[in-house]
Amino acid sequence: MILDASTKQAWNLYVSQHAREMEEFIQTWDHKGCAQFKLEKIRCDWNPSRRMSRGGLYSSKGIRIPGISIAMSRYVPTYGDPVRHYEYKSFDADKFIGGFYTDNMEHPLLAVIAHEVAHAIQFWLWWYNGTAYGKPHGKEFKKHYAKLRAVFVNPLLPDQNEMGKAYRKHKNIVAKEAFFTPVEVIH
């Protein structure tokens, strides 16, 4: 899908606004360093070859700053068909922070923003408090991600049983169409 500059700019603003809302929410958390948390870098990368998003600490003029970089071409919202948003295998089945079904592609984009902001606060707190780094998708990450998902993503999601049925039906129809496409036979 080719998007014009103004459409990309609108989606960049969407990402920035939601990341800022998450930043403000984190600043209310009762944990040393949260009040000082500020996303100094919010980047939307539209390069189609960019497949992975990132959140964490970046270096700017020798200073460590929290930030996120979102691989946008993978999450450009399209609407209509049900999709399955996957999370990392270790927690994809988790009912609260795992994968989900939706027919609104803003939902996976919001989940990716929340996921990367969770990494940014995770790494920020490790650096700010001088504590040892833990696992990137360990308990601390999951705790931060769960808080963000509870406020910014999960309340928007459709009924997962119904959407899961719609997704499986859609995938079955698509698979059957691909399998049973008539082929002209030349004798």
Question: What is the role of each PLM region?
Answer:
Residues 1-111, 120-187:
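Active-site-proximal or metal-binding-adjacent scaffold patches in catalytic folds
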Residues 116:
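Walker B catalytic acidic pair
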